[in-house]
Amino acid sequence: MPLQSSRLAVDNGTPVRGKPWPVWPQPTDGTLDALSRVLRSGRWAISGPYRGVESAERRFARRFADYHRIAHCVPASSGTASLMLALEACGVGAGDEVILPGVTWVASASTVVGVNAVPVFADIDPDTLCLDPDAVEAAITPATKAIVVVHLYAAVADLTRLKEVADRHGIVLIEDCAQAHGAEFEGHKVGTFGAVGTFSMQQSKVLTSGEGGAAITADPVLARRMEHLRADGRCYRDQAPPSGHMELVETGELMGSNRCISEFQAAVLTEQLGELDRFNALRRHNAELLDALLTDVGYRPQRSTPGTTARTYYTYVAELPDAELPGADITKVTEALTAELGFPVAPAYSPLNANPLYDPASRSRFALGPQHEKLIDPARFVLPVSGRLTRRLVTFHHAALLGDESDMRDIAEAFTKVLQHRAVLAA
């Protein structure tokens, strides 16, 4: 790979890349027809009148469950909503402690305080950036009700050990798979190892309808509870109603709220699901090429837990070389890479004990008394691995992995060029 000697693009030099990159989302050939069918159907929501045919929402739920070889799928309005459904369906509530990783998207924690429970942040594994089982074990108390394991960026967490810890202590294990659609561990899809697996279908995700989510489970009781929780306390009838009547029935079993997706979203998701494996395979192939190129010049790509049989690349992540960039300002590095490549390169998520997006004290709804406020104060947690690593990680969105080998070489060339100019990137 030729080394660049020109000035950095951020310093008025010539960028490595001038061509456009692949965009995301990418609609399938059948998406417009699927949306048109919903538009003409007379039913745009699950609360709309039954028209004698399977709804788009039920069709997607059935196919997503089949994809995971699991019995039940409950679609929802977002990944956040799906995680809240899972927590409440599993009985997590006021005063319960929920262990989750110190580095993840803020919703993994905000959903916990949203059900009046207490997030407990545990540190991460330095290789996978996922929840460290030893840190989880150390964080368990008599108040621990659940563990939320997040499969972060492009890694699968250590499900063998985390499931063993959860089972041994009688704690519910919930998988947050918002960034891991289609990933596999020991030949099984993620989301099928815990009591519930939750997914996000937001714009940036590898399976998307702009906004949306889903929860999967093998447990019919949990599935029925989640149906009630997402549809204002209603669930599907056992038998189809007469045409023109609503499929949902009021049972009085469990109060819920409206967290449903529309028929339009479900139609898009069904189309996208048919392309998920193809896109995932392309990203995986290109990520493996890039791993080799970046490793050659000293970067350290994110790893996945041994036993991972299929990775899903939501975000590509690499750690800066210690020798060449020991004291680099991560913001300067990501700005330099962005200027070279023409797409956003960003630092990793800030640890949740110091993340400006996670501030329960800014919401009066969480002011439930001095003791509760003390428990949900994120500053009480010490996360040394999270703090150290997030100052050394660069990340970019999976859309760039939808190109070809020459695109991966452009990315590697930009990363190499930045190394050449390390003196100007020091903190």
Curated annotation (Swiss-Prot):
Pfam families according to UniProt: DegT_DnrJ_EryC1
Function comment: Catalyzes the PLP-dependent transamination of 2-deoxy-scyllo-inosose (2-DOI) to form 2-deoxy-scyllo-inosamine (2-DOIA) using L-glutamine as the amino donor. Also catalyzes the transamination of 3-amino-2,3-dideoxy-scyllo-inosose (keto-2-DOIA) into 2-deoxystreptamine (2-DOS).
Superkingdom of this protein's organism: Bacteria
Modified residues (N6-(pyridoxal phosphate)lysine): 205
Involved pathway(s): Metabolic intermediate biosynthesis; 2-deoxystreptamine biosynthesis; 2-deoxystreptamine from D-glucose 6-phosphate: step 2/4; Antibiotic biosynthesis; kanamycin biosynthesis
EC number from the UniProt entry: 2.6.1.100, 2.6.1.101
Claim: Transferase is one of the keywords in the record: yes
Chain residue ranges for the region called Disordered: 1-20
Cofactor(s) needed by this chain: pyridoxal 5'-phosphate
Family label: Belongs to the DegT/DnrJ/EryC1 family. L-glutamine:2-deoxy-scyllo-inosose/scyllo-inosose aminotransferase subfamily.
Keyword terms, alphabetized: Aminotransferase, Antibiotic biosynthesis, Pyridoxal phosphate, Transferase
Record has Transferase as a keyword: yes
A GO molecular-function descriptor: transaminase activity
GO BP, one annotated term: polysaccharide biosynthetic process
Name under which the protein is recorded: L-glutamine:2-deoxy-scyllo-inosose aminotransferase
Gene field: kanB
Reactions it catalyzes: 2-deoxy-L-scyllo-inosose + L-glutamine = 2-deoxy-scyllo-inosamine + 2-oxoglutaramate; 3-amino-2,3-dideoxy-scyllo-inosose + L-glutamine = 2-deoxystreptamine + 2-oxoglutaramate
